[in-house]
Design a protein with these regions (language model features):
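...captures the hydrophobic TM-helix bundle architecture rather than a specific catalytic motif
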Residues: 1-199
Length: 199
């Protein structure tokens, strides 16, 4: 007979715990949003090349290289901000967080300028053709998430400047960071589908 006391335990009490409610909530939100984006991306891919009238993506789209670099770079800066907060370095946290906000704002500004050019110069609206409908739906959906993220980033910065953000609130800041990484990751998919495959 095997002595149960001699068997190694897979884990000891206290070695693990359930994730916090915040983490469960943000992961659930991200999964839900990912499903929504998947549907819209699939619709965009399905309708590629099916517009009966112009303009076409090849005729009017310009690849947003600089704004894409800025948005993806914001994932690096927010990661550096998180690290600074864990080390209780408020100055560096605020600096990197502010840079993240500026990069996000630049991306939104570039998107707005692109839309202005498409509408005023090329007369591409959401009603022009299937390309216009799917383009504004997909890019607009992503832009709306960037706006939400930018509002959250700004709220955190204001709270930090008022002395309300410390290392004790790191998990809350991490949740904002997770959301922002998700927004950036989605843009990689949108960029690939719209500006690479779709052209």
């Amino acid at each position: 007979m095997i002595n149960d006391a001699s068997l190694p335990l897979a884990f000891e009490p206290g070695d693990w715990s359930l994730p916090s409610a915040r983490k469960v909530a943000i992961v659930s939100l991200i999964l839900t949003e990912a499903t929504l984006f998947s549907i819209v991306v699939a619709a965009y891919v399905f309708y590629i090349g099916k517009s009966l009238t112009g303009p076409t993506p090849r005729e009017v789209l310009e690849t947003p290289i600089i704004s894409t670099i800025c948005l993806l770079g914001s994932s690096v800066t927010i990661m550096l901000a998180e690290r600074a907060l864990r080390r209780e370095n408020q100055g560096r946290f605020q600096l990197w967080w502010m840079i993240t906000i500026l990069l996000a704002a630049f991306f939104l500004g570039a998107t707005a300028l692109e839309w202005h050019r498409l509408i005023t110069v090329h007369h591409l609206t959401i009603r022009t053709n299937l390309f216009g409908t799917t383009f504004y739906s997909l890019v607009g959906l992503h832009a709306s998430h960037v706006i939400v993220g930018l509002c959250l980033l700004t709220l955190v910065l204001v709270s930090s400047l008022r002395g309300l953000v410390t290392a004790k609130q790191h998990e809350r800041i991490q949740m904002v960071s997770w959301y922002w990484h998700f927004v950036d990751a989605v843009w990689v998919v949108v960029f690939t589908v719209v500006y690479v495959i779709g052209r």
